[in-house]
């Protein structure tokens, strides 16, 4: 296959700057950026098929037109990339036939495909607005190809662009596919190269890129990219602006989020419930609950009704701040305006009251949940079990564990941790350790907090043998060890005259960065 290279410098980092303006359209000509500094689109002359190659192309074309796949199958052994390419060029006006032949050649003789054959079918599909099919082929190439292949795909499309009388949407599809695959460097390169040749991606593809960036926590880059979109006169849509609001909120720039909300009308858009919910969540995250309530009240003035997400966000904010009366008040308002609470609503309130130790209120919300036919999940029961175990009411907690079977729910790590905590509160460390073993047998994984609860419970009972057994489990599972806990266990063992056990325990901890000298006196 011909090795392709171009003289455009590849950007391996962002060069995004300030923003301005408008653009973006389905009309291919409007993908062109203004100005005359664009690099000309190159054109490569490809050799025409001759002799046996020409005969093959003509015969294959005839069989394709007549849908005579039996005869075509007999030609499959003679396929190569040059012949496949020229057949695809000959039938490119029929995208269905092109795709059918492309897939047939891939199945019958995979070695007959090259980047050039892929490029031609991609041009054909995008010209006919079959973007999902094009992106499916691109995804297959980019995921299953070699390490250096992504960098070559743009070049292959570029050098066949004029030959196929293509449209900029072929590069747009490449950019969007890189975005969906979270290949951010390749997406950046494609964006910068598109600009070099006078093309811009659609706002939908830009949204896909920003969404992937935000999904990976790359808020700073997403916001810089938005500024570059505006500088390139790519007009945002409401989905874009809601993502930018989310980015501002996640980076703590709440004032900028509010400014953008106010600017939406100037940009030709009405704020949506998503816009307000995003800002409400941002303010709740920062503990600015009064401001969050004001935003909820602003929704009505804007002709929007708070929905279940709005109320759930506020309830979660108040519960996290342990302002449970305010959370209950929001719940009451929610029901008053006929917004139906869901599983998330009840779970948040049940968990909040359980954390506070008010099991009666938690159980009241649980009963209301049952009466209203709201689906309970493992989080519902874990919250109730946690609240009961926190108060050492392990028998009542066990009743809810039995409820899990009736609801076809399986205990998870949080369920076992709560039950272990209950036994530790009751100073039943041995029973807690038995629950730990059941937890492991069930395939659940305890965390550092669970182990430390068990160690503390054994130490309170002055059962340092049991505590050392838990420490060994922690070492075996590479759970971080707290030096004060280790000192406490080892000193307890020494006071009981179990120096050999201390020595053995410290040997097992070798390499865990604990100083043994302090235990040798």
Curated annotation (Swiss-Prot):
State where the transit peptide lies. Answer: 1-38
Record localization: Mitochondrion
Identify the stretches annotated as PPR repeats: 167-201, 202-236, 237-271, 272-306, 307-341, 342-376, 377-411, 412-446, 447-481, 482-516
Q: Which organism is it from?
A: Arabidopsis thaliana
Name this polypeptide is given: Pentatricopeptide repeat-containing protein At4g26680, mitochondrial
What family is this protein classified in? Belongs to the PPR family. P subfamily.
| Superkingdom of origin organism | Eukaryota
Keyword flag Ligase: no
Which is one Gene Ontology cellular component term of this protein? mitochondrion
List the keywords (alphabetical).
Answer: Mitochondrion, Repeat, Transit peptide
Q: Which Pfam families match?
A: PPR_2
Matching entries from InterPro entries are given as: Mito_RNA-Proc/Resp, Pentatricopeptide_rpt, TPR-like_helical_dom_sf
């Amino acid at each position: 296959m011909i090795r392709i290279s171009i003289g455009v410098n590849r950007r391996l980092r962002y060069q995004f700057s300030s923003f301005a303006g408008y653009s973006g359209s389905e009309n291919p000509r409007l993908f062109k950026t203004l100005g005359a500094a664009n690099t000309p689109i190159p054109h490569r002359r490809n050799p025409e098929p001759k002799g046996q190659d020409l005969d093959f192309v003509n015969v294959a074309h005839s069989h394709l037109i007549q849908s005579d796949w039996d005869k075509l199958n007999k030609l499959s052994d003679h396929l190569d990339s040059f012949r496949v390419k020229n057949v695809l060029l000959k039938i490119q006006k029929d995208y269905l036939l092109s795709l059918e032949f492309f897939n047939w050649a891939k199945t019958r003789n995979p070695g007959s495909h090259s980047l050039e054959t892929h490029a031609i079918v991609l041009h054909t599909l995008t010209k006919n607005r079959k973007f999902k099919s094009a992106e499916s082929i691109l995804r297959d190439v980019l995921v299953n190809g070699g390490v250096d292949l992504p960098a070559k795909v743009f070049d292959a499309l570029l050098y066949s662009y004029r030959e196929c009388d293509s449209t900029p949407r072929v590069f747009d599809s490449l950019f969007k596919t890189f975005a969906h695959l979270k290949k951010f460097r390749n997406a950046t390169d494609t964006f910068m190269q598109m600009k070099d040749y006078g093309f811009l991606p659609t706002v939908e593809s830009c949204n896909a890129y920003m969404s992937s960036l935000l999904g990976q926590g790359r808020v700073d880059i997403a916001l810089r990219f938005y500024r570059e979109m505006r500088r390139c006169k790519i007009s945002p849509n409401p989905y874009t602006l809601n993502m930018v609001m989310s980015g501002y909120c996640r980076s703590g720039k709440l004032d900028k989020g509010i400014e953008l909300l106010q600017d939406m009308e100037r940009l030709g858009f009405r704020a949506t419930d998503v816009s307000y919910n995003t800002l409400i969540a941002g303010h709740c995250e920062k503990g600015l609950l009064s401001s969050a309530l004001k935003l909820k009240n602003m929704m009505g003035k804007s002709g929007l009704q708070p929905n279940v997400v709005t109320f759930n966000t506020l309830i979660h904010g108040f519960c996290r701040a342990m302002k449970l009366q305010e959370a209950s008040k929001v719940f009451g308002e929610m029901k008053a305006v006929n917004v139906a609470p869901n599983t998330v609503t009840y779970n948040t309130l049940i968990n909040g009251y359980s954390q506070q130790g008010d099991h009666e209120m938690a159980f009241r919300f649980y009963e209301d949940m049952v009466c209203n036919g709201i689906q309970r999940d493992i989080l519902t029961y874990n919250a109730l079990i946690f609240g009961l175990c926190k108060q050492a009411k392990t028998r009542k907690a066990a009743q809810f564990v039995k409820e899990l079977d009736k609801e076809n729910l399986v205990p998870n790590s949080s369920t076992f941790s709560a039950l272990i905590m209950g036994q530790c509160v009751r100073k039943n460390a041995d029973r807690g350790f038995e629950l730990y073993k059941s937890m492991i047998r069930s395939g659940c994984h305890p965390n550092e907090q669970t182990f430390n609860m068990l160690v503390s419970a054994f130490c309170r009972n002055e059962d340092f043998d049991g505590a050392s057994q838990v420490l060994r489990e922690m070492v075996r599972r590479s759970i971080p060890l707290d030096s004060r806990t280790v000192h406490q266990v080892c000193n307890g063992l020494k006071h009981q005259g179990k120096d050999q056990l201390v020595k053995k325990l410290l040997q097992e901890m070798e390499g865990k960065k604990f100083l043994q000298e302090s235990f040798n006196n």
